[in-house]
């Protein structure tokens, strides 16, 4: 019997040793393959496709960690776009974490201290509140997006291990399901191949590489039409002015010390023509009368139209859920990865949050050539980002739907209830404003606010006296709210939306920290 126990123990030890040796051999083989890849890739650790806010910020962050970065951008001239003109307080904090907050200086950016809302002759101003658990000033920045992008590019290019090049990426280079680099045309028209162990695709909402990496489709929700009124200043230049106009919203805000951006949202299926003057007529006759005369909002809105509208622009508002890219050697970021309605102006904040997370995950790796290790880290990145991204995606989607004017009594009741909830100015409003500003990204807290807005809307519809018709419409409000919320619970994940530990971990690791 004693010998049997000894033989059993010996067999167990030998089996463990064999498995351990096999595991060590596999690890050694993986390291050797990684070293071989590193030798092949030569002077570049990361190729970044696109040098917008996301691409330029990521290039700087990775280069500061010692990575050799090659950035390929289609057009290095200053972008002339009117999206991405509000950096929320949470986004400013992320820039500070990356060492990039000085890029908001010297671009004539304006402080964004509050949201002003207007509906049917009533208005309220909702300041971004002080939050003791948010280690930064609760103030955003209103700005010219192109100026910010140029500052970020300059900051990235100032590092010796960043190569910023103008060129158009044509395709990704793949070998056995692993992305090894890109093929691109440089500014001289030469076709070049570039290799790196990691390629990051962040070439924006019109990405031509995304469809080869993820099975995802974008949805066009509406169009934003915008122009700049020059030599003007709002009486309240530190608020984002949101007008509950019909059929969709208008937004007015100060982007420089003497320029005001005016934006009107129009339905995707009925956008007036800009070239033949229909748009000017639409803005002047349909939208301008809905702009409140409070302050000088309507005056500035009309001034821009009457001065000839030299640079009226339109852009599609899009929505696209984030999807895991299962190919190794590549990551998708920014608007190429995840989009939401711009009503809460938080796209840049989500992208910068993603960059902070990704930088921290990659930082411990001595090199990026072990694609399995990088792939495993990227899978965890998709989970860690959820508190910020799910909160913003859900809030943007539901707000954009609720603020659509309609003759439907239930939906109009929800729209009025939303205004009433925001206009209260109590602790509930302050809590929602910390979420809007990115100071408290917490999906469960957002869900509770949405429930409260729904109940407020139902109460508004039932007062002063309930009737069978009003009761029926209040039930329709509840059903619609559950439908909207349920869609996001499915899309973002029940666990990620409803379990508070994920949000607590995100806040502990990425907000309650000191600037690096």
Curated annotation (Swiss-Prot):
SUPFAM superfamilies: FAD/NAD(P)-binding domain (SSF51905). It holds the Pfam family SE. This is Squalene epoxidase 4. Its EC number is 1.14.14.17. One of its GO terms (molecular function) is flavin adenine dinucleotide binding. Keywords: FAD, Flavoprotein, Membrane, Oxidoreductase, Transmembrane, Transmembrane helix. The chain crosses the membrane at residues 2-22, 43-63, 435-455. Catalyzes the stereospecific oxidation of squalene to (S)-2,3-epoxysqualene, and is considered to be a rate-limiting enzyme in steroid biosynthesis. It comes from Arabidopsis thaliana (Mouse-ear cress).
């Amino acid at each position: 019997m004693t010998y049997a126990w000894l033989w059993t123990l010996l067999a167990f030890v030998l089996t463990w040793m064999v498995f351990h040796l096999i595991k060590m051999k596999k690890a050694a083989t993986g390291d050797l393959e990684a070293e071989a890849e590193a030798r092949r890739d030569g002077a570049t650790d990361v190729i970044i496709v696109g040098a917008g806010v996301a691409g330029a910020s990521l290039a700087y962050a990775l280069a500061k960690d010692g990575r050799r970065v090659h950035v390929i951008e289609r057009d290095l001239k200053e972008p002339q776009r009117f999206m991405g003109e509000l950096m929320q307080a949470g986004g400013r904090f992320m820039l500070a974490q990356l060492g990039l907050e000085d890029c908001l200086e010297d671009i004539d950016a304006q402080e964004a201290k509050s949201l002003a809302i207007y509906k049917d002759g009533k208005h309220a101003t909702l300041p971004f509140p002080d939050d003791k658990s948010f280690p930064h000033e609760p103030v955003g920045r209103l700005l010219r997006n192109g100026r910010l992008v140029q500052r970020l590019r300059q900051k990235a290019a100032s590092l010796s291990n960043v190569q910023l090049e103008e060129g158009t990426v044509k395709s990704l280079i793949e070998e056995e399901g692993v992305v090894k680099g890109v093929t691109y045309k440089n500014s001289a028209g030469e076709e070049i191949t570039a290799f790196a162990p990691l390629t990051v695709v962040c070439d924006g909402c019109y990405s031509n590489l995304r469809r080869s990496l993820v099975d995802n489709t974008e949805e066009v929700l509406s169009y934003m039409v915008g122009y700049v009124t020059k030599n003007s200043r709002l009486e309240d230049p530190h608020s984002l002015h949101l007008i509950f106009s019909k059929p969709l919203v208008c937004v007015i805000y100060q982007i420089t010390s003497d320029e005001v951006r005016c934006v009107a949202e129009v339905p995707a299926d009925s956008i007036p023509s800009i070239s033949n003057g229909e748009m000017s007529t639409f803005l002047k006759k349909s939208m301008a009368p809905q702009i409140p005369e409070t302050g000088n909002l309507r005056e500035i809105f009309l001034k821009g139209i009457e001065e000839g509208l030299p640079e009226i622009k339109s852009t599609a508002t899009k929505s696209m859920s984030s999807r895991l890219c299962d190919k190794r050697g590549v990551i998708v970021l920014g608007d190429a990865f995840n989009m939401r309605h711009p009503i809460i102006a938080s796209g840049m904040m989500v992208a910068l949050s993603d960059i902070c997370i990704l930088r921290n995950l990659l930082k411990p790796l001595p090199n990026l050539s072990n694609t399995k290790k990088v792939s495993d880290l990227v899978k965890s990145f998709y989970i860690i980002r959820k508190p910020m991204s799910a909160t913003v995606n859900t809030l943007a989607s539901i707000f954009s739907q609720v603020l659509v004017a309609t003759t439907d009594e239930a939906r109009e009741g929800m729209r009025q209830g939303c205004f009433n909830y925001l206009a209260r100015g109590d602790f509930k409003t302050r809590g929602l404003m910390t979420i809007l500003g990115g100071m408290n990204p917490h999906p469960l807290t957002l869900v509770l606010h949405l429930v409260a807005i729904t109940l407020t809307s139902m109460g508004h519809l039932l007062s002063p006296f309930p009737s069978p018709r009003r009761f029926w419409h209040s039930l329709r409000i509840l059903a619609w709210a559950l439908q909207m919320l349920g869609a996001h619970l499915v899309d973002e994940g029940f666990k990620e939306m409803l379990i508070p530990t994920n949000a607590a971990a995100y806040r502990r690791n990425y907000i309650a920290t000191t600037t690096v």
